[in-house]
Amino acid sequence: MSAAAQLILHLTALNTPERVVSIGKVEAAGATNVIPDRVYMEGTMRTFDERERAEVKRRIEELAAANDASYGVRTRVHFTPGYPCVVNDPELIRQAVALAETEGIPFQMLPLRMTSEDFGFYGTRYPAIFYRLGVGPGAGKLHTSTFNPDGAAIPTGIRFMELLARNYFNR
């Protein structure tokens, strides 16, 4: 358990504004007076680009190996292939902003986020833009049981998506 706890601390130290590593699940089959012979951990890693993701993976492997040497344990690191980083095409962003301004659709530029979505696969093959549709205050947080968006936002979302598509194909 001590080795696992130390590894979690080392992994957390990797966090910067450009990358996040977190362990959200730890399982150990011990008891109050029995030190477990195995500890299983799962976590997530988020970055803004694939180059940084590869670097974080390399650092995780290094930290695990150093931790193994310090504690006399063996760590098996396994990375489950996840979604690629969501990267917006700068030209599509420019076009979307211009369309929103021209059409009087309110918008707000958000700071970069480490979005993990299957949409990231599209951006690896085609110019793509991932945007969020504001659904009003009090809608609750996304991916929670309290999320209750205002349905009146849907027509605006449909209209904006149609405008983006028409603009893209008419250029």
Task: State the predicted function of each range.
Residues 1-88, 113-120:
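Midchain, well-structured core segments that form catalytic/ion-binding scaffolds
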Residues 105-171:
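Zn-dependent metallopeptidase/amidohydrolase metal-coordination segment
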Residues 55, 88-91, 149-152:
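Alpha-helix N-cap and loop-to-helix initiation/capping positions
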Residues 3, 59, 95, 156, ...:
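Charged catalytic carboxylate motif
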Residues 86-99:
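Short, low-order "capping/linker" segments at domain edges
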Residues 11-15, 100-103, 168:
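Sec/Tat-exported extracytoplasmic proteins
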Residues 60, 64, 100, 161, ...:
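Hydrophobic "lid"/C-terminal helical patch
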